[in-house]
């Protein structure tokens, strides 16, 4: 089976070039990066929860996550400036394609009642946002490892100028959009 990067170069790029009539191969949209963010919400007071979330995200993405900190103090949320509020990873290059392949072929099919991803989650600039409710859909995370089920936000940043181009790119890459 060919990798996602090879599929992009050999099949997706020429198809998009023909579909949208690009004059240069460099004008064809490509995936720039994937950002995975896991906000911890109520467990922000527990430092072990942050370490656990970082460890799980590192297992899933094969890259050490960055701990995100609060920018401002908000008294209603009992939040102080500089307190850790989540973890995030930015994937580029080969790791990005490996993660996307894992998400498409293993992760998404394991979601309960999965009928495809929402086609309306584009941001108007060619980027796609996807929310996942539990980290158990990835094979690296076993049920015994999980102390609390956490979700994550996945942002796929593309070089596409419009949502239509980005959707064509992601659909050609194999993301299963809902009809």
Swiss-Prot record:
Name the gene behind this protein. rplE
Q: What does this protein do?
A: This is one of the proteins that bind and probably mediate the attachment of the 5S RNA into the large ribosomal subunit, where it forms part of the central protuberance. In the 70S ribosome it contacts protein S13 of the 30S subunit (bridge B1b), connecting the 2 subunits; this bridge is implicated in subunit movement. Contacts the P site tRNA; the 5S rRNA and some of its associated proteins might help stabilize positioning of ribosome-bound tRNAs.
Q: Which UniProt keywords apply?
A: Ribonucleoprotein, Ribosomal protein, RNA-binding, rRNA-binding, tRNA-binding
Q: Which organism is it from?
A: Deinococcus geothermalis (strain DSM 11300 / CIP 105573 / AG-3a)
Q: Which domain of life is it from?
A: Bacteria
Q: Name one GO biological process term.
A: translation
Q: What is this protein called?
A: Large ribosomal subunit protein uL5
Q: Top-down, what is the taxonomic lineage of the species of origin?
A: Bacteria, Thermotogati, Deinococcota, Deinococci, Deinococcales
Q: What's the family?
A: Belongs to the universal ribosomal protein uL5 family.
Any single GO molecular-function term of the entry would be: rRNA binding
Tell me a GO cellular component: ribosome
User: What is the protein's quaternary organization?
Assistant: Part of the 50S ribosomal subunit; part of the 5S rRNA/L5/L18/L25 subcomplex. Contacts the 5S rRNA and the P site tRNA. Forms a bridge to the 30S subunit in the 70S ribosome.
Q: Name the InterPro entries on file.
A: Ribosomal_uL5 (IPR002132), Ribosomal_uL5_bac-type (IPR020930), Ribosomal_uL5_C (IPR031309), Ribosomal_uL5_dom_sf (IPR022803), Ribosomal_uL5_N (IPR031310)
């Amino acid at each position: 089976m060919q990798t996602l990067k090879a599929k992009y170069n050999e099949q997706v790029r020429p198809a998009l070039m023909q579909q949208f009539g690009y004059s240069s191969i460099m004008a064809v949209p490509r995936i720039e990066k994937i950002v995975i963010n896991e906000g911890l919400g109520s467990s922000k007071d527990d430092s072990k929860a942050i370490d656990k979330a970082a460890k799980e995200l590192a297992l899933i993405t094969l890259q050490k996550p960055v701990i995100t900190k609060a920018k401002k103090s908000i008294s209603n949320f009992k939040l102080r400036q500089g307190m850790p509020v989540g973890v995030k990873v930015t994937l580029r290059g080969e790791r990005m394609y490996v993660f996307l392949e894992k998400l498409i072929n293993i992760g998404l099919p394991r979601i309960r009642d999965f009928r495809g991803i929402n086609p309306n989650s584009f941001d108007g600039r060619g980027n796609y946002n996807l929310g996942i409710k539990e980290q158990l859909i990835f094979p690296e995370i076993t049920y015994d490892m999980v102390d609390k089920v956490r979700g994550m936000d996945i942002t796929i940043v593309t070089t596409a100028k419009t949502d239509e181009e980005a959707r064509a790119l992601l659909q050609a890459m194999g993301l299963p959009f809902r009809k």
